[in-house]
C-alpha cells in the first residue's frame, strides 16, 4: 500500500524471525509448473531428483474450518463440528479474560475443547493451568494442523497478502502461505522483495500438491509437508526472489462478540471515556466494556428511532461479518440506545482525509482504500442487504490504512422529520441516488451511486461533493443529467468509473463485485504508467 503503513507495535502481533542460514542467491520470478512428479524424500523431507515418491507415514493434517480476516490478519474459525474428532487445540494469540466465565490463555498454550456447539465461544480446559472457561474460537487452531503455523494465513486474497507484505518496515523475504484463489487444494507462497526498478514488491509462487501427497514449487524440489517446504526455503533461495526470512507480522483478530452471551448488555457495564465525534442523531465515544475491553460506543438521542425496530434490525446487523465491515459487538436497547462496536483508532475516513495524514496520501493508497470499501460492500451485496448511507463519514480507518464500512442499515430506522422527508436539512442528499432521494427506492444500486460520490471524496481529500451547490440545486441538476467533472489530477479512467456508478438507470450501474475487482487491479490493468503528482 505504500510507505504510510506502520508495523503493529503491541504485544499481540505474531512475528517470528526464521533461523538465519547461508545466503543462496537464486533467480527471481515464479517457477514453471511441470507434470505431477513422483520422487522420494530424504530424511529432512527434501526429495532428491531420482527416486520414487514414498508417502509420509502420517497423512497431512486436514484443514479445519474457514478463515475470516480482521484488521490485518485472518484466523481460523469454526465451520462446523470438530473435524475428525479433534479436541486439542493450540492458542494462536494471547487472550485476557473479560468476564468471570471466560478463560485467559497465552499464545502456544494447549487447550482441550469441552464443548464447541455454542457458536463463536467454546468451553475449553487449559492443559497448562488446569482452568476451564469460554474462549473465542477464532483465537485457536487444531494442534499440529496447518492453521496452527504462524505463516499460514488461509483464505486471504492475493491483494490482501500484498497489503500486509508491502509494509516498508518488513525486511526482504517476509512471507506468508495462503490458499490459492484459482486452484482448489493448492497454496501460494507470497514473499516481499525489493529492487531498484520496482521498489518494494511482492512475488507469488504457486505451491502445487502431488497426487500421492507432498508439495512442490518447482518439480526438482519436493517435500512431504508445507512445514518442510517453508523450512527449506528459509535456508535456500533456490530460485525464489529471496530466501524466507520473517513471517509476515499480524495483529490479533476481533473476537466475534464481546464474550459468551454478551449481546444486550447493561448500560452500567460501559464507561464512556473520550468523545470522538457528534452528529445530528447522537455522539460517538471511545470507551471500555466491563472494565476490560476497548470499544467504540455510539449513543443515539432519544426519539431517533424505535427501540423495538432497532433491536430487530440489530439482530440482522450482528450476523453481517466481514473483515471490511465494522463489527457490531453489543447493544443497550433501552433509550438512550447505545451501539457498541469495535474501535478503529484513526477515526472516520472523512476526518482522516482532511487531517495531517491526508495531504501525504497519493493515488495508490486512495485506490487501495476504495478497493477495501468496495470489498466490504460486495459482501453486503452478496448478503442482499442495503447500506443506505454510504459516504466517507461512515467509513472508519485503523492502522495501516485499513478501512471498514460502518453504520450499515441504521439510516432506514431514523424517525426524525428533517431526515425522513429525504430533502430535509439532515438528509445526505449529495450522496443519494436520485431514485432514492425522490421516491425512497433504496437498493444496493443506490449504494453504488453513493460509492461513486465517495470516490470523489477520496480523490479530493474530503471536499464536500458538488461544491457551491445547495441540496435542492443538486437534485434538480442531477435529474437534468449533470454529473460532477473529473477532480484535479484524477485519472480519466477513475472518473469514468464514477460516471458508471452515476448512470441514471440503477440496473446499468456496476456491481460492487466488479468495482472491487477493477480497483484491486487498477495499477496493473488500467493505469500501469501512473506517476505520482503534487496531490495524487
Swiss-Prot record:
- A Pfam family matched in the record: PK_Tyr_Ser-Thr
Q: Which residues form a coiled coil?
A: none
Phosphotyrosine: residues carrying this PTM: 187, 419, 530
Which cysteines form disulfides?
none
| EC number, as in UniProt | 2.7.10.2
Q: Which residues bind ATP?
A: 276-284, 298
Q: Where is the Protein kinase domain?
A: 270-523
Q: How is it modified after translation?
A: Myristoylated at Gly-2, and this is essential for targeting to membranes.
Which SUPFAM superfamilies does this chain map to?
A: Protein kinase-like (PK-like) (SSF56112), SH2 domain (SSF55550), SH3-domain (SSF50044)
Region Disordered, as annotated, extends over 1-49
Q: Where in the cell is it found?
A: Cell membrane; Mitochondrion inner membrane; Nucleus; Cytoplasm, Cytoskeleton
Q: In what ranges is there compositional bias, type Basic and acidic residues?
A: 7-19
Q: Taking every annotated instance into account, which residue ranges of this chain make up the domain SH3?
A: 84-145
Q: Where is the lipid attached (N-myristoyl glycine)?
A: 2
Q: How does it sit in the membrane?
A: Lipid-anchor
| Reactions it catalyzes | L-tyrosyl-[protein] + ATP = O-phospho-L-tyrosyl-[protein] + ADP + H(+)
Annotated SH2 domain ranges read 151-248
Q: What does this protein do?
A: Non-receptor protein tyrosine kinase which is activated following engagement of many different classes of cellular receptors including immune response receptors, integrins and other adhesion receptors, receptor protein tyrosine kinases, G protein-coupled receptors as well as cytokine receptors. Participates in signaling pathways that control a diverse spectrum of biological activities including gene transcription, immune response, cell adhesion, cell cycle progression, apoptosis, migration, and transformation.
**How would you summarize the oligomeric state and partners of this protein?**
Part of a complex comprised of PTPRA, BCAR1, BCAR3 (via SH2 domain) and SRC; the formation of the complex is dependent on integrin mediated-tyrosine phosphorylation of PTPRA. Interacts with DDEF1/ASAP1; via the SH3 domain. Interacts with CCPG1. Identified in a complex containing FGFR4, NCAM1, CDH2, PLCG1, FRS2, SRC, SHC1, GAP43 and CTTN. Interacts with ERBB2, STAT1 and PNN. Interacts with CDCP1, TGFB1I1 and TOM1L2. Interacts with the cytoplasmic domain of MUC1, phosphorylates it and increases binding of MUC1 with beta-catenin. Interacts with RALGPS1; via the SH3 domain.
**Could you say which protein family the record assigns here?**
Belongs to the protein kinase superfamily. Tyr protein kinase family. SRC subfamily.
Q: Indicate what this protein is called per its UniProt record.
A: Proto-oncogene tyrosine-protein kinase Src
Q: Which organism is it from?
A: Rattus norvegicus (Rat)
Gene name linked to the record: Src
Amino acid at each position: 500500500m505504500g510507505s504510510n503503513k506502520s508495523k503493529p507495535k503491541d504485544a499481540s502481533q505474531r512475528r517470528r524471525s526464521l533461523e538465519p542460514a547461508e545466503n543462496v542467491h537464486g533467480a527471481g520470478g515464479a517457477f514453471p509448473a511441470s507434470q505431477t512428479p513422483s520422487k522420494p524424500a530424504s530424511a529432512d523431507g527434501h526429495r532428491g531428483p531420482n527416486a520414487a515418491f514414498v508417502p509420509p507415514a502420517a497423512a497431512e493434517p486436514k484443514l479445519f474450518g474457514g478463515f475470516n480476516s480482521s484488521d490485518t490478519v485472518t484466523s481460523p474459525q469454526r465451520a462446523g463440528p470438530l473435524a475428525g474428532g479433534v479436541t486439542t487445540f493450540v492458542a494462536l494469540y494471547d487472550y485476557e479474560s473479560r468476564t468471570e466465565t471466560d478463560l485467559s490463555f497465552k499464545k502456544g498454550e494447549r487447550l482441550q475443547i469441552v464443548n464447541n456447539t455454542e457458536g463463536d465461544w467454546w468451553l475449553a480446559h487449559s492443559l497448562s493451568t488446569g482452568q476451564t472457561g469460554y474462549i473465542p474460537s477464532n483465537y485457536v487452531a487444531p494442534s499440529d494442523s496447518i492453521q496452527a503455523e504462524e505463516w499460514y494465513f488461509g483464505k486471504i486474497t492475493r491483494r490482501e497478502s500484498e497489503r500486509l507484505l508491502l509494509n516498508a518496515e518488513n525486511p526482504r523475504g517476509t512471507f506468508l502461505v495462503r490458499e490459492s484463489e484459482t486452484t482448489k487444494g493448492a497454496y501460494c507462497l507470497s514473499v516481499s522483495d525489493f529492487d531498484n526498478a520496482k521498489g518494494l514488491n511482492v512475488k507469488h509462487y504457486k505451491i502445487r500438491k502431488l497426487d500421492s501427497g507432498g508439495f512442490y514449487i518447482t518439480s526438482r524440489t519436493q517435500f512431504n509437508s508445507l512445514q518442510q517446504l517453508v523450512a527449506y526455503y528459509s535456508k535456500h533461495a533456490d530460485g525464489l526472489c529471496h530466501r524466507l526470512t520473517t513471517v509476515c507480522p499480524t495483529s490479533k483478530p476481533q473476537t466475534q462478540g464481546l464474550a459468551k452471551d454478551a449481546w444486550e448488555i447493561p448500560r452500567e457495564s460501559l464507561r464512556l471515556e473520550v468523545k470522538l465525534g457528534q452528529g445530528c442523531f447522537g455522539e460517538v465515544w471511545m470507551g471500555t466494556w466491563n472494565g476490560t475491553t476497548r470499544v467504540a460506543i455510539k449513543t443515539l438521542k432519544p426519539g431517533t428511532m424505535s427501540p423495538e425496530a432497532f433491536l430487530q434490525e440489530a439482530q440482522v446487523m450482528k450476523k453481517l461479518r466481514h473483515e471490511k465491515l465494522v463489527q457490531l459487538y453489543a447493544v443497550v436497547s433501552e433509550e438512550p440506545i447505545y451501539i457498541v462496536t469495535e474501535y478503529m483508532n484513526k477515526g472516520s475516513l472523512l476526518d482522516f482525509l482532511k487531517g495531517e495524514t491526508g495531504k501525504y496520501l497519493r493515488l495508490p493508497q486512495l485506490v487501495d482504500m476504495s478497493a477495501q470499501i468496495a470489498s466490504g460492500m460486495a459482501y453486503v451485496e452478496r448478503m442482499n442487504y442495503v447500506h443506505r448511507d454510504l459516504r466517507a463519514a461512515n467509513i472508519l480507518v485503523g492502522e495501516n490504512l485499513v478501512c471498514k464500512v460502518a453504520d450499515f442499515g441504521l439510516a432506514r430506522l431514523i424517525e426524525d422529520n428533517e431526515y425522513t422527508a429525504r430533502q430535509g436539512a439532515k438528509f445526505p442528499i449529495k450522496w443519494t441516488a436520485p431514485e432514492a432521494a425522490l421516491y425512497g427506492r433504496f437498493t444496493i444500486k443506490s449504494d453504488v451511486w453513493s460509492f461513486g460520490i465517495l470516490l470523489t471524496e477520496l480523490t479530493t481529500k474530503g471536499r464536500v461533493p458538488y461544491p457551491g451547490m445547495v441540496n435542492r440545486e443538486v437534485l434538480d441538476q442531477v435529474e437534468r443529467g449533470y454529473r460532477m467533472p473529473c477532480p484535479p489530477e484524477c485519472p480519466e479512467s477513475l472518473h469514468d468509473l464514477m460516471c458508471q456508478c452515476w448512470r441514471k438507470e440503477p440496473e446499468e450501474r456496476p456491481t460492487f463485485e466488479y468495482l472491487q475487482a477493477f480497483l484491486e487491479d487498477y495499477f496493473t490493468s488500467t493505469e500501469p504508467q501512473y506517476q505520482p503528482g503534487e496531490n495524487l
